[in-house]
Amino acid sequence: MRSHHLRAAAGDSAIDLAAAHYTSPYITVYKFSSGFVSKYSDPSTLPTNNGIGVDFSPDGTHIAVAHVSSPYVTAYPWTKGSGFGTKYSDPSTLPGGNCLGIAFNPDGTVLALAQYINYSMSAYKWTSSGFGTKYADPQTLPHSGHSITFSPDGTLVALGSVYSPYITVYPFNFNTGFGTKYSDPSTLPAGGGRGVAFSPDGSDL
């Protein structure tokens, strides 16, 4: 298994650790305390195919998986100590293709996805009951999104993509969604953007 096909995310207080992976059940979560303690039971309804990305909501009450094959994203309630709840309904408007990256915004009200084909990113309002309305796609889209993240204050969203310019950044507003794409960096990354992250204070990318 290549490392970029195993994605992990820590839950509340780093007590739960999730990995999205190839091969059923596609998502695996462990209790973690000074090392691996035990594996949680798999969800009763699995993602439909290979898991590529995973993220917990900031409050640790939801977990979402980006994966291959429709519906491309699957999300569940999460309870520390007991694990997966019943799968949320799929979004009414699905992402355009296989999703490789996934991220909640810092306050847990938006869920963003990096897509490899048919557009490169999608974002949805997120509520306590699951997926809300899909935001309009940004006007300028790079090709083949691979990773996605929000700035610590939630006002920026950055996409790593396989093809030039390899990294793209947009303003983001909860009410209006994506703003106009920022200019590309004067010196581009040397190749495909497989991962992307802001520094803790949001001043570096």
Stretches found by the model and what they are:
Residues 1-12:
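Enriched but not universal
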Residues 29-37, 75-84, 123-132, 169-178:
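Short loop/turn segments immediately following beta-strands, especially the blade-tip
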Residues 11-13, 58-59, 106-107, 152-153, ...:
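Residue-level detector of Asp-centered blade-edge/turn motifs that repeat once per structural unit
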Residues 38-45, 86-93, 133-140, 180-187:
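A short beta-strand motif characteristic of beta-propeller blades
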Residues 50, 98, 144, 192:
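Beta-rich catalytic cores
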Residues 22, 68, 116, 162:
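Short loop/turn segments immediately following the C-termini of beta-strands
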